[in-house]
Each structure stands twice: as structure tokens, then as C-alpha cells.
Amino acid sequence: MPRKGHVERREVLPDPVYNSKKVSKLINKVMWDGKKSLAQKICYGAFDIIREKTGRDPLEVFEEALNNVMPVLEVRPRRVGGATYQVPVEVRPERRLSLGIRWLVEYARQRSGKSMMEKLAAEIMDAANNTGGSVKKKEDTHKMAEANKAFAHYRW
């Protein structure tokens, strides 16, 4: 185990267009092989599609989608004796945000056909309407936590 203590978290700079840290984190999640300008094109293109289709501010729609995707509870394995129990725990705010963004991008990538811009826009709009793969993932996570409620006293 490392002996140097905790590494300090680096602050994410807000993106230049929407001046939002959440959008900046989305861009970083979409990015592959360090191609940030391409990731920015994809995200801003997706936001333009959202503005076109909904007639609302894309940042608002994105925030709504994130709120519908971010999990409140998750299960973590805890070994007690010879058995491993899935113990439900609350998710810390930073992890909630990163999981929400990760799931949005992951399920956007899994969508068939079309460009990544369109897939990301569709996933964000679906999540804002409480449908789509990323919302289903959150619900499944919550179901797992609910099913393992009996082991909640094994928290650490």
C-alpha cells in the first residue's frame, strides 16, 4: 500500500462554451486517445441537436438527464467469514456525478448506427425523459441495493 498519503484531486476547468464543469467532465469521458478537440466537436454537436429537437437550453436538458441517471445507492462486496455479501451503501456526490456521466456515454456508445453526436444527443434526451439504457442501469443498481437491504448493517 502507498505510504505517501492521499493524492490531491485536480480541479476540472469549466468548458469554454457553456462554462460548466459537468460539460467539461462529459467531454473528458467522450474523449479517446487524447483527442479532446474531436470530443468537444461531438459534445457540442450533440448539444446543438438537443437544442434543435427540444427547443430548450441543452445545458438544462443535460442537467435533468444527469439527475435522472445519478445513483443514490449502490452495492459493495463485503467479506464476512467465508461469505461475500453485497452491502448497500450511499454513493458519494463526486462518484454519483462520475457514474452518471460514465453511464450516459457508455450507453450512448452502445446505441446502433448513426454518428456519436446523434447517439449522445439521443441518450441525453432519453435520460431527461426517464427512459434509455443509462436510466435502466441506475434502476437496476437501486434494485440490487433494495434486494440486499438485509445486509445494510455490515457497513464500514
Swiss-Prot record:
One of the primary rRNA binding proteins, it binds directly to 16S rRNA where it nucleates assembly of the head domain of the 30S subunit. Is located at the subunit interface close to the decoding center, probably blocks exit of the E-site tRNA. The keyword Cytoplasm does not apply. SUPFAM superfamilies: Ribosomal protein S7. One of its GO terms (molecular function) is structural constituent of ribosome. Part of the 30S ribosomal subunit. Contacts proteins S9 and S11. The keyword Zinc does not apply. Keywords: Ribonucleoprotein, Ribosomal protein, RNA-binding, rRNA-binding, tRNA-binding. Belongs to the universal ribosomal protein uS7 family. GO terms for biological process: translation. One of its GO terms (cellular component) is small ribosomal subunit. PANTHER family: RIBOSOMAL PROTEIN S7. This is Small ribosomal subunit protein uS7. Gene3D superfamilies: Ribosomal protein S7 domain.
